[in-house]
A protein has these predicted regions:
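Phosphate/pyrophosphate-binding loops and the adjoining catalytic core of nucleotide-dependent enzymes
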Residues: 1-4, 74, 318-321
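A short, local hydrophobic-aromatic micro-motif
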Residues: 30, 85-88, 226, 244
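Active-site Asp-x-Gly
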Residues: 205-208, 213-273
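An alpha-helical support segment within catalytic cores of ATP-dependent transferases
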Residues: 8-28, 123-124, 129, 137-210, ...
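ATP-binding pocket architecture of kinase catalytic cores
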Residues: 32-158, 184, 202
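Helix-rich C-terminal or lid/interface subdomains of diverse kinases
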Residues: 129, 244-321
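Short, surface-exposed alpha-helical segments at coil->helix boundaries
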Residues: 14-15, 71, 253-257
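Short beta-strand segments
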Residues: 57-59, 88-89, 150, 207-210, ...
Length: 321
């Protein structure tokens, strides 16, 4: 077992990644790099004498069960023509390793978070339109049930509305118990969730990208999307939640407005209100873990810094109740 506090973790995982790739692809490894990116998993980039370029992503011990669904979901998305990593193996049937893992071909590109500051207006527009198109296509994948997915095709709960309600009240309890937010903000959240959803979802049982943030979106030099990565925390439910989850992290940034304007479908007032509702959902789901370190052992930022979009979402929801 590898502990996240072990100073030699990068060395141990580089060694494990090399072994996995050599056995999986029957080749010799030339170089292994421990990537200092991502907060929920450990990533190694492995290059071989046969010009293979592979990412081995290790799940921390308390997230080991993710391997039971993420590789299959990635393959399902890939086969549907979506720009996601193509898995070539994982720890369920592949070579042994200290932690559960998925291995996939490296995707060229840099994160949108890194490239956006240097993009001119044209490339920002290209990125906004292409990202909107990619995310809109995600809702074509159906998920049986609701809430956290447990396989590539099914989620844990039966009712989306019940899942959302339970998650929100659980998050509120954590906020109160651990004093994660200012009392006035906590009271406002409680009033909003007690009033109930601003509308009812017209569509459910669709894939929701629960890991959406600009650090999980790869772009080319011209601004076009080259890959959507990290699908470990996806949900089944109202596809508008993907927009709400994005708004929680990036809703206060100018590019988010450009992205929203590029959305292929005109959104009604009720749908805009639901997006704000799902922004609150992401914040409250994170609240259940905000007092704990990340699965990788790194400390978390304060909740309101992680999800600044909660403030404008609350304003909107408060105004309609």
């Amino acid at each position: 077992m590898i502990e996240t506090t072990d100073k030699s973790i990068s060395h141990a995982l580089k060694k494990a990644a090399a072994s996995v790739v050599e056995e999986m692809l029957s080749t010799h490894v030339l170089a292994v790099e421990f990537l200092l990116q991502g907060m929920m998993t450990f990533k190694c980039r492995v290059r071989t004498e046969n010009n293979d370029d592979v990412i081995v992503r290790f799940y921390p011990a308390r997230r080991s069960s993710v391997v039971d669904h993420e590789p299959d979901l990635l393959m399902r998305c890939y086969r549907a023509g979506m720009t996601v990593p193509k898995p070539i193996g994982d720890s369920r049937s592949g070579p042994s390793a200290p932690l559960s893992y998925v291995a996939y071909r490296y995707i060229n590109g840099e994160t949108l978070a890194d490239r956006l500051p240097s993009f001119d207006a044209l490339r920002r527009q290209v990125a906004a339109e292409d990202l909107a198109s990619h995310l809109y296509r995600l809702q074509s994948l159906t998920i049986e049930g609701a809430g956290e997915i447990v396989t590539s095709r099914a989620a844990r709960n039966s009712s989306w509305d019940t899942f959302v309600e339970d998650a929100m009240f659980a998050g509120l309890v954590s906020i109160k118990n651990y004093k994660l937010l200012e009392p006035s903000l906590t009271s406002e959240i409680e009033r909003v969730i007690c009033a109930g959803p601003p509308a009812h979802a017209s569509v459910t049982q669709r894939l929701i990208w629960g890991d959406i943030n600009f650090g999980n979106i790869l772009v080319n030099e011209d601004g076009r999307i080259s890959g959507l990565i990290d699908f470990e925390s996806c949900l089944g439910g109202d596809p508008l939640a993907t927009l709400g989850y994005a708004a929680a992290i990036h809703g206060t940034e100018p590019f988010f407005s450009e992205f929203r304007q590029a959305w292929p479908q005109t959104l009604s007032v009720e749908e805009e209100n639901l997006i704000a509702w799902y922004t609150l959902l992401r914040a409250l789901r994170l609240a259940c873990y905000a007092h704990l370190p990340l699965p990788t052992g790194r400390p978390r930022d304060p909740l309101v810094h992680i999800v600044p979009g909660i403030i404008p979402a609350l304003r909107r929801l408060t105004a309609i109740h």
